[in-house]
Amino acid sequence: MSVTVKRIIDNTVIVPKLPANEDPVEYPADYFKKSKEIPLYINTTKSLSDLRGYVYQGLKSGNVSIIHVNSYLYGALKDIRGKLDKDWSSFGINIGKAGDTIGIFDLVSLKALDGVLPDGVSDASRTSADDKWLPLYLLGLYRVGRTQMPEYRKKLMDGLTNQCKMINEQFEPLVPEGRDIFDVWGNDSNYTKIVAAVDMFFHMFKKHECASFRYGTIVSRFKDCAALATFGHLCKITGMSTEDVTTWILNREVADEMAQMMLPGQEIDKADSYMPYLIDFGLSSKSPYSSVKNPAFHFWGQLTALLLRSTRARNARQPDDIEYTSLTTAGLLYAYAVGSSADLAQQFCVGDNKYTPDDNTGGLTTNAPPQGRDVVEWLGWFEDQNRKPTPDMMQYAKRAVMSLQGLREKTIGKYAKSEFDK
């Protein structure tokens, strides 16, 4: 039913509206309704030997072409194969049948890249032995380039160097420290499709001898799906099922975002799906599962997790422009309910020596909180408290955050510390 808004002075009817300044989300299933292939554009006019030299010298000089990188990766990886032990399909695309031997690029549709190939500097000293570590290095730079935090960036680069040295003991980094020529590679759709294809392939063939190539590609999986990760983290830290966690959603904004994420038919729970790579495969330009598109859910879930002593939640990003008051209260109530009850039950017995709980709780006052985690009981109790956090709830939250130190600005940890440790 529509609501009519009138100006009191003259009964003029107005229709309040906000500007449509955000792009709508795009679901992976919708992509495959329009197209049955993921095109990958590669220039294949140069030999692998030439491309190997172009990439090697280009990295050392700081003037490498992403077209050379993509062409080299294709040439070096196209013969890697794996044998399926089960049928593999996703969104109606038949990738392979059980017993088939498939390659990385069977996940995409190869197309010729038109245009003139940039010049490159040859290097006759480079051999096919480089193909055992150079693809790992090129793919690893994708992961390094995605972070701008200097300490973490150095840690990732050191890890990449160690991975390459495990293959070639004489390996030395080709990109000098401080040079960031590879940061923009993530803007090239063909490069990101190669990254996604490599990770999806080795996720299926985890024991493949080249599976270490996932060092750099693993961040492509569930990219821009932070809110979905929040849901999974909340289920783990509460020890509750997805259904039970969902019943604890008490805010309309969170419910709307949950419904957005749980749209049927998106293969969220299918491990070998294209879905986790919706961004890098170009299936979606606006993920329905990101913290940007689900700020209320992300905040509520991470705050609840933090109050349940999650170390991971402390550095979660604090969204802007959300209804903090109600979301904070909802997160506090949920965390207090879980933290005040232990979901303990005898799991095994010897003979018939089983504990039978006494249903007679007796001795409880009307002001005492429920002993379980039933949201209906807790909401009834919260109503009796005039829908305001009790002193014990506030003390519980303070104990959860009082020891937090070194918190970064605009994080859930920083927000909770300032909110509860007063």
Swiss-Prot record:
Keywords from the named record: Capsid protein, Helical capsid protein, Host cytoplasm, Ribonucleoprotein, RNA-binding, Viral nucleoprotein, Virion
Residues that, per the record, bind RNA: 143, 152, 206, 214, 286, 317, 408
SUPFAM superfamilies named in the record: Rhabdovirus nucleoprotein-like
Gene Ontology MF terms: RNA binding
Stated name of the protein: Nucleoprotein
Chain residue ranges for the region called Interaction with the phosphoprotein: 350-390
Record's keyword annotation contains Magnesium: no
Xref: Pfam families: Rhabdo_ncap
Family classification: Belongs to the vesiculovirus nucleocapsid protein family.
Gene: N
